[in-house]
UniProtKB/Swiss-Prot annotation:
One GO MF term: heme binding
Tree of life domain: Eukaryota
Phosphothreonine modified-residue sites: 8, 108, 134, 137
Subunit structure: Heterotetramer of two alpha chains and two beta chains.
SUPFAM superfamilies xrefs: Globin-like
Phosphotyrosine sites (modified residues): 24
Residues that hold heme b according to the record: 87
N6-succinyllysine modifications at: 7, 11, 16, 40
Family membership noted in the UniProt record: Belongs to the globin family.
GO CC terms, sorted: blood microparticle; haptoglobin-hemoglobin complex; hemoglobin complex
Protein name in the entry: Hemoglobin subunit alpha
Modified residues (N6-acetyllysine): 16
């Protein structure tokens, strides 16, 4: 459960991304594909090379979804319902992949926002991403 301090940290962190959300989302995806090659199986039709338009486009989708979740942190199930349906019923993404992407997002944010990535912010973002992952996998059951 996200505390009031966690929610404040999450919202502040997402505001600090500014116009870089899409680039950071793409970088996190690229990190995931390089570190965990089995995750590429869900993207057989994508050009996964560095800087590809498809990678950038999906990075933007990830960043936009997380920005929406951060803006609606008090109602994650409502904010992510359509994405949960998509990933569970149509795409059938293995739930472990959400944890892998969450880890890569944390690494990316830490690399780009080192002064802001305090232990408290790290913990808050980790809890937030775990909550997002839980919601996204809730319809698998």
């Amino acid at each position: 459960v996200l505390s009031p301090a966690d929610k404040t940290n999450v919202k502040a962190s997402w505001e600090k991304l500014g116009g870089h959300g899409a680039a950071y989302g793409a970088e996190a995806l690229e990190r995931m594909f390089l570190s965990f090659p089995t995750t590429k199986t869900y993207f057989p039709h994508f050009d996964l090379s560095h800087g590809s338009a498809q990678l950038q486009g999906h990075g933007k989708k990830v960043a936009d979804a997380l920005a929406n979740a951060a803006a609606h942190v008090d109602d994650l199930p409502g904010a992510l319902s359509a994405l949960s349906d998509l990933h569970a019923h149509k795409l059938r993404v293995d739930p472990v992949n959400f944890k892998l992407l969450s880890h890569c997002l944390l690494v990316t944010l830490a690399a780009h926002l080192p002064a802001d990535f305090t232990p408290a912010v790290h913990a808050s973002l980790d809890k937030f991403l775990a909550s997002v992952s839980t919601v996204l996998t809730s319809k698998y059951r």
